[in-house]
Amino acid sequence: MDPKLETEEAIGRASVVIDCTPSGVGHQNKERYYHKFDDKVKGFMAQGSEDGFGVKYARGINDSVLKNGDNQFIQVVSCNTHNISCITNTLALDGHGPENLKEGRFVCVRRANDTSQAGGFIPAPAVGGHSDEMFGSHHAKDASELFATLGYELNLFSSAMKVNSQYMHVLWFALKTKEPTNLNEVKDRLAANDLVAMTTKNMTSTVYSFGRDHGHFGRILNQTVVEI
C-alpha cells in the first residue's frame, strides 16, 4: 500500500491520532510532529510501551480522564497492566471503593515473543527483576499510576517472568480485601463484566486458537480471560 499523504498532512487532517509505532517511536513522534498540531487535533493516543506519553487509560476503569477534553495525550496501558487493573477493579474496588483493597500481589508469566515476531524467542523460562522497590516490576507501578488518575493510592506489587511460548500471558494474583467474599461472588463479578471473558479452556494455545477462529478479526479484545 502506497501512502497518499505526507506525515504532517495526514496528522493535520485527523481528528484523533492513534500511534501504533514500535517502542520509543511514539515519544519521538510527539516531539517531532504532534506538538505542532495540538491546537487542531483533538487527541493523540499511544500504546503501553510509551510510558510518560500522556495520562494512563484503560477502558471501563478511568473513563473520566477522557471527558471534557482535559487530557489531549493518552497512553493506553499495556496488556499486562490491563490484566492487573481489570482484575483489581472487578474483584476488589467495584462497588466498594479503594479502601476495600488491603493489598494486591501479582506474578505476570509472559510469553517470550509475539507470533508475528521472528526474533526474541527464548529457549527456557527466564526470571525478571524488580525495577521498583515499592511496586516490584513495572506492571504494578503502571497499574498504580492508572488508578492514581482517580485519586486512588493502592498497595500493589508484581513480579514477572518469561516462558518459552508465543501464546498470550498468564497472571497469578492474590487480593486481600476488607469486605468478605466467596467463590460464587467472585465468579458473578467476573461474569458481570463485559470486558472479562470466561472459559473452561486451561491452555493458552487453545484460548488463542479460539480467539483466532471466533474473535473480532481473529483477536481477543477482552481485558482478561479467566478459566473456571
Tell me what each language-model feature is.
Residues 1-115:
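N-terminal Rossmann-like NAD(P) cofactor-binding subdomain of oxidoreductases
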Residues 1, 100-228:
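C-terminal substrate-binding/catalytic lobe of Rossmann-fold NAD(P)-dependent oxidoreductases
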